[in-house]
Amino acid sequence: MNKFIVVGAGHAGLEAAFILSKLNNKVYLCVLDRKYVANCPCNPSVGGPAKGIVTREIDALGGIQALAADSTALQRKILNSSKGPGVQCLRFQIDKVYYKKWFLEQIDNNENIELVEGEVTEVIKNGDTATGVMIDGVKKLEAGAVIITTGTYLKSLTFSGKDVKNEGPEGFKNSNNLSEWFKVNGFELIRLKTGTPPRIKKDSIDYSNLQIEPGNGTELYFSHWSKNKYIDYELPCYLIHTTEEIHKIINDNLHLSAMYSGNITGVGPRYCPSIEDKIVRFSNKPRHQIFLEPESLELDTVYLGGFSTSLDISVQDKIIRLLPGLKKAEVIKYGYAIEYDAINPIQLYPSLESKLIKNLFFAGQINGTSGYEEAAGQGLIAGINANQKIKNKEPLILSRDEAYIGVMIDDIVNKGVTDPYRLLTSRAEYRLLLRNDNVLDRLIQKGYEIGTISKEQIDLYNQNLEKKNKLIEFLKDKKVGMYTLLKAHTNNTNFSLYEFLKRPEIKLIELLKLIEFDYSNYDLELLKNIEITVKYEGYIKKESRIVNSLKNLESIKIPKDLIYDKVQNLSIEAIDKLNKIKPLNLAQAQRISGINLADIISLKTHLEQNA
């Protein structure tokens, strides 16, 4: 049994550990303290635009986040249901206390995972290969590969106004030694910042005039494989807005924000700004949305989504109590910003292995990303590829047309990050191919080939695929008169049901009911997938043609030891960027910032001449 070390037990570390254990490996899961496992220091939710699709992609490859979210959901929502299928997704409020308990139970019941408490102070090397770690500077752990998933704990500082603390999220202990080790061993570190909102005592809020934000019912699931539920009902969220009075107080007290006083040197997230950042950057907006979200059935706290802040607590007290329904609010925990070290991810291969040290992988916020889902997606890929590396197998590298996980990793390893990277649907060129409903079509076969998807799972998928294909053939063959379908005074021209379903106002279930077709052995998700496949056939084929036209560049591999200075007519900037990033193929090289078409032509010519 091969041995692996995972450093950090957050969303990335857990995904890496469980996928490695599923592949029959021994995993040492290192964490500062057992209570840090599966911590959710920011929003108590999983999913959202693009991110929710990542959670389903993880599930299709055999990962665990979808099961955890389904098993701990307090509210389930479909987002963007009125928009096109390329942007529809799931978002669940989760119980952050039970989410942690759920993962600890999974760890305790898994013979292949051993939880090791203590601070990892350095990575042990043999030449240029990682072989283990030191715990607390004294205990040596050895393994075939090491995966770093330290989140926001490296040299972290928290800020509320002028108050600065040498600590990790939620007052937890941070980790300082590993940052120094990375620096000494040639890694380029960057300083990033994120933040979290205040938590309010649930019973101190007046809900009487607040706009309720209900869920969409308890029969929604991230996972394709199980129908786990935490509760058979849903807790509501509430929507409120900031006021101009609040904006004025924030503007008048920007000098008391750690972000604007100069205390923080790290770069904050562009797409998840603090409330003071929103007021400054979007000064023309008279109000901003704030969501009141429950954190747990076991906690008396409500999360103020959209109200992240590093303002002094005296200012926080004022502006919180000016929010609708919060006049008598009791603050359980004040908002704060956190600054931390990360590595520049251009130092990684698309497999998430380090270019500097073999068998050393990185995943999650250490790579400059933000979000639980982004972290989990990287953890899964790092775990799979650490396994592949030790077993001398090809790494799993998902392309931009196969998965949002592929889009994210391609972005960060080719372009690096300057602020915490967040996945957005707009980052994907092929959104219609990367839908919420077709995740299994895209990825399950890869999971099965690697060994993370079981024979039972692939058989179930193939049964559904056969049912899908049969129904599509039936729709193509079945001709029905227009009068029968519309009951309108028109000529009774015969149309296939397939053609008729392409009309935007026609729903598949309504059509099947009309012709009295028994669809009871089709689940609703499969019917939705069939409907989208038919309605968007032309657009899907168009995107697929574009993808296929670019595949040629991906097939032209670039040797890792290629000396770019010897490639004729390459620009100096191109040589510098290519030496830094070391792309694996021409398609990856083309996506690097600063590489132009002339550089690609020169590189292609050189590779062909030296094939």
From Swiss-Prot:
It is found in: Cytoplasm. It comes from the Bacteria. NAD(+) binds at residues 268-282. Pfam families: GIDA, GIDA_C_1st, SAM_GIDA_C. Disulfide bonds: none annotated. Its cofactor is FAD. GO terms for cellular component: cytosol. FAD binds at G8, A9, G10, H11, A12, G13, V120, S175, Q365. Keywords: Cytoplasm, FAD, Flavoprotein, NAD, tRNA processing. The keyword Nucleotide-binding does not apply. NAD-binding protein involved in the addition of a carboxymethylaminomethyl (cmnm) group at the wobble position (U34) of certain tRNAs, forming tRNA-cmnm(5)s(2)U34. Homodimer. Heterotetramer of two MnmE and two MnmG subunits. This is tRNA uridine 5-carboxymethylaminomethyl modification enzyme MnmG. It comes from Mycoplasmoides gallisepticum (strain R(low / passage 15 / clone 2)). The gene is mnmG.
